[in-house]
Amino acid sequence: MLLRKVLTTEECRRLVNEFDASATRQLEGDAFYRGSIGLYQPPASLALVERLQRQLEPVFGSLEFENSYLRAYLKGSILGIHTDRPGLDVTLSVCLEHDFEGEYPLWCSRQPFFGPWKDNLESHEAWKSDAVALELALGDGAAMDGIRYPHWREEFKQDGRAVYIFFHWRRRRPPVTEPPKPTG
């Protein structure tokens, strides 16, 4: 689901400035985030959660916010194919900075993956061969069932950087009001 201009230019700028000034951002070295720089839950992102959640709930149902994560991609960075961990049912990825020539799409498979993602799969062809490229302009977002649909970004080959923030929610489950009735 594409959401055009879900964040204003000023909101994007505020988040990027907080990221650039943060002493807690980390250079990622593992295979799935290689060469990117990340920041867990920038405080400025929390002020946006309620408004964004209201836009998502008509499509995804009742949600409970889990966390946000901001990531900058530099030349050589990747986001390996994966599904989000349990508890991160719905993901909203928003472009905060597009300081490069060309495109850097978020790829999302149309084929679901059931169960915890397995990093050691011999091939990802079943998911990569039936995928859609989601190109996000500044302030645009893409929302998906991140726990169910594999998604990734290919290697960032451009000069400059691409900065995105990811908001994650879990689906609220209706409370159990009565114990199950015995059968048999």
Q: Predicted regions span which residues?
A:
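Non-heme Fe(II)/2-oxoglutarate
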Residues: 1-60, 78
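Short strand-connecting beta-turns/loops that link adjacent beta-strands
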Residues: 8, 86, 159-160
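A short coil-to-beta-strand element that immediately follows conserved catalytic motifs
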Residues: 60-70
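A cross-taxa feature marking solvent-exposed loop/turn segments within ectodomains of secreted
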Residues: 63, 99-101, 160
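Catalytic core of non-heme Fe(II) oxygenases with the double-stranded beta-helix
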Residues: 75-147, 174-180
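Histidine-centered active-site/metal-ligand motif
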Residues: 82, 150-151, 168
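A short hydrophobic beta-strand segment most commonly corresponding to one strand
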Residues: 91-94, 158-175
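Short, charged beta-turn/beta-strand-edge "cap" motif at the junction between a beta-strand
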Residues: 147-151, 156
